[in-house]
Amino acid sequence: VELMEKEGVVFKLDTEIGKNYPAVKLVNEFDAVVLCTGSTKPRMLTCEGADLKGVHYAVDFLKANTKSLLDSNLEDRMFISAEGKNVIVVGGGDTGTDCVGTSIRHGCKSVTQLEIMPELSEERMPNNPWPEWPRIKKTDYGQEEAIELYGKDPREYLTTVTKIEGDDMGNVKAVHTVEVDWSTGA
């Protein structure tokens, strides 16, 4: 970042364009504009049982892990531990991959990653030519670690959660899923 600043890149952090910095001013003052965003609010699960003990959102899981790692190399134990747990990650994107990898490094018993979309081809399809962004299957570090450790890809495609079942203490006991059928345009 320092090198980029020395080269003339200006960073405007924690800025709400249109509110505390006019969009027209931004466009007029700079040769190029790059908007970098990140979500601090999770996409909430809407199924029964989403409020049970043991259901954690990625932003909370990853943020606490990173803070504990940077502050104490995880020695303060101020993170949500996946150690010894059977982990279900809902979501197949980069954040889901981070959750898979972090859970493995915690020493989870198993990890399954649910992906609502179909498995993509390893090669470009005719309707996805260059220079479009390639819509191909991407096996990232989290999945690679799972394959190495457990002998199989953790991803379950065309799958979504319908219910999270709890025990008498309010802890997650089971996750109910259903296969998604996109052929009807659902």
Model regions: which residues?
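A Rossmann-like FAD-binding core segment of flavoenzymes
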Residues: 1-44, 66-77, 104-186
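A residue-level detector for conformationally permissive "hinge/kink" positions
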Residues: 30, 52, 76, 83-85
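Short glycine- and Lys/Arg-enriched binding-loop motifs that mark or flank ligand-binding interfaces
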Residues: 34, 45, 87-89, 99
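Flavin (primarily FAD) binding-site architecture
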Residues: 36-51, 55-59
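Mobile, glycine-enriched helix-loop/loop "lid" segments at the mouths of ligand-binding/catalytic clefts
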Residues: 52-66, 181-183
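Beta1/beta-strand and adjacent pyrophosphate-binding region of the FAD-binding site
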Residues: 80-93
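Short glycine/serine/threonine-rich phosphate/pyrophosphate-binding segments
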Residues: 94-100
